Amino acid sequence: NARWNLVEQAWSMGISRNLVGVEFDEDNQLLFTRVNARRVDITSCRDSLNGYQKGRCFYCFKPISLVPGDAELADVDHFIPWAARQEVSNINGVWNLVLACRCCNRGVEGKSARIPELRLLQRLHTRNEYFIQSKLPLHETIVLQTGQRPEARKSFLQRNWQAALDKLIHTWKPNAEGEATF
């Protein structure tokens, strides 16, 4: 029933059901999401993610836009890169998605398939906790994807970050483009 509620909520918010499809692992007693090993459309969550980022790139704080066709249209980025999808649980989960400027996501000096440095993982944890505490519609999804307690959620992020780092090896640090706002 909780899984169906998440899907209904996603539809009402215009978010792709692929971002909140929750399955149950009987052996490990875990809820998880998976869409085979293929990419799914994750751009439907721009507006929801912007509730925290308030028009700024998650990495460098440069102003971003949510208007389709705008030169500064935000990319929806996998914080832990898609390239680590075999090592990371539910890579398309909302817990792992952030809004990024094009330079940070795919520019010459951008993140691409590198792992954001550890201090940015703390920023992601803070962002996820914000969604959970604010009781915004994404809060239940993030709890189901990452854990019931803050310690479990932090451990989930750390485990996945380390698994991705073990595979991809290289970390990345953004250049500040604006004042830190979150």
Q: Where in the sequence are the language-model features?
A:
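Extended charged
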Residues: 1-34, 112-182
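Cys/His-coordinated zinc-binding microdomains
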Residues: 61, 102-105
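Residue-identity detector for glycine
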Residues: 14, 21, 51, 55, ...
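Short pre-active-site segment immediately N-terminal to redox-active cysteine/selenocysteine motifs
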Residues: 56, 97-100
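Histidine-centered nuclease catalytic patch
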Residues: 61-97, 110-123
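Short, charged surface segments at domain edges that flank catalytic/cofactor-binding sites
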Residues: 2-63, 83-91
